[in-house]
Amino acid sequence: MTKPKDTYTSEQIQVLEGLEAIRKRPGMYVGGTGLSALHHLVYECVDNAIDEVMAGFASTITVRIGVDGSCTVVDDGRGMPVDPMVSDNPAIDGRPAIEVIMTQLHAGGKFDDNAYKVSGGLHGVGVKCVNALSKWTDVEVTKETKTWMISFSRGEVDKPLHIVEEHKGKKRRTGTRVTFLPDPEIF
């Protein structure tokens, strides 16, 4: 172990970008890197699905654990927003809302009563932890007549938001499917 410097100056101050802080210090966000932290990732996705049920927009939640260790949480709620953000911040303006939700700390719809009266999880942080601490994350959203998908690798956009299916004029079920593989570099 190296001895700390006798002086404490601006040279020791770090500014971490994006989800880097979560990957660097997962214990601050999910309580560590052990089994309970791994479970915390699942709970965050389930909490989001429960929020849709509690708000009266969903009735079914499905959780699947894959043979590869991945986890999928599906709800039949409204589906995460996929429309472009409108913001004075040029780093956010025009980006798909789902991308911002998955990658920007403290971005979400649970800070006031406009989208949810009751909600669980780490508001504006939870699903970002899942994304940051996973080797890969796929999010699929069905809204109106389309199914959209966005993919991430260790918290970074891997495949931008795109339409994976058009439902030929007929309205389909709505909802969100989050599938992630916890990162073996972390857990």
What are these regions (language model features)?
Residues 2-12, 69-97, 108-187:
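GHKL-type ATPase core
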Residues 34-38, 65, 122:
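Secondary-structure capping and boundary motifs in well-ordered enzyme cores
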Residues 1-46, 50, 100:
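Bergerat-fold GHKL ATPase/HATPase_c domain
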Residues 21-24, 28, 51, 55, ...:
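Conserved helix-loop functional segments at active or binding sites
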Residues 35-60, 126-133:
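Conserved ATP-binding N-box helix of the HATPase_c
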Residues 60-67:
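Short beta-strand/loop element within the Bergerat-fold HATPase_c
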Residues 54, 64, 169-171:
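Sterically constrained small-residue positions within well-ordered secondary structures
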Residues 25, 44-45, 49-52, 76, ...:
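Generic, well-ordered alpha-helical scaffold segments in large soluble proteins
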